């Protein structure tokens, strides 16, 4: 995996690669950590992690993975209820990852509303909003909503929109494109993401069709 990245880009993505390798000590890629375990691996000694999961089987697996971990807790709580309840944190700094299952038709609307409620209480926090790209109208509406919220806060926040496609989107086909809205990112992140994504297009794209979108969303 290292050979695919330049000397400039490799240090940027190495922490992530190291986490994945830790779950695959025999070097064959058989296991992939989900976002809670990736987040846990990146915690500093002074950090803590709260994960919310209502699906029983997924929650049990997560509890088992984080058992006896004094820096992490798993709650049987709807994330939409937890989102406004847990912000702002006592530390006043932190990151909120919102990645719903998108099993309901109104999931994009709930994401927009949930983010708005949390952001109103904690506009200085950092947020990651993950979404599948299937309906361009839905993703564009979400991006505009987030841009409006961030731009209207005082002081105004910042946001980035990142989307990555491994193949052209075809109606009723499998998911080939996903996105992130990143609110209040570190100031270096835009350049770092661009460097990484430029080197991921070819190896991850199917038949040379890998593409990414990286921009500041507009209201």
Regions of interest found by a model, annotated:
Residues 1-219:
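Class I S-adenosyl-L-methionine-dependent methyltransferase catalytic core
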């Amino acid at each position: 995996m290292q050979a695919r990245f330049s000397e400039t880009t490799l240090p940027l993505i190495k922490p992530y690669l190291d986490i994945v390798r830790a779950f695959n000590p025999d070097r064959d890629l058989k296991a992939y950590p989900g976002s809670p375990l990736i987040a846990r691996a990146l915690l500093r000694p002074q950090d803590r992690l709260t994960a919310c999961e209502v699906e029983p089987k997924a929650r049990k697996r997560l509890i088992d993975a984080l058992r006896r971990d004094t820096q992490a807790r798993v709650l049987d709580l709807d994330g939409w209820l937890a989102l406004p309840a847990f912000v702002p944190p006592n530390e006043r700094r932190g990151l909120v990852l919102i990645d719903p299952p998108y099993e309901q038709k109104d999931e994009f609307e709930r994401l927009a509303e949930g983010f708005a409620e949390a952001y109103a209480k904690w506009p200085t926090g950092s947020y990651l909003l993950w979404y599948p790209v299937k309906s361009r109208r839905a993703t564009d509406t979400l991006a505009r909503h987030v841009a409006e919220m961030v731009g209207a806060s005082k002081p105004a926040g910042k946001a980035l929109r990142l989307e990555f496609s491994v193949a052209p989107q075809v109606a009723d086909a499998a998911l080939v494109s996903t996105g992130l809205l990143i609110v209040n990112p570190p100031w270096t992140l835009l350049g770092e993401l661009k460097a990484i994504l430029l080197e991921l297009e070819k190896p991850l794209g199917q038949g040379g069709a890998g593409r990414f979108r990286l921009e500041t969303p507009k209201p």
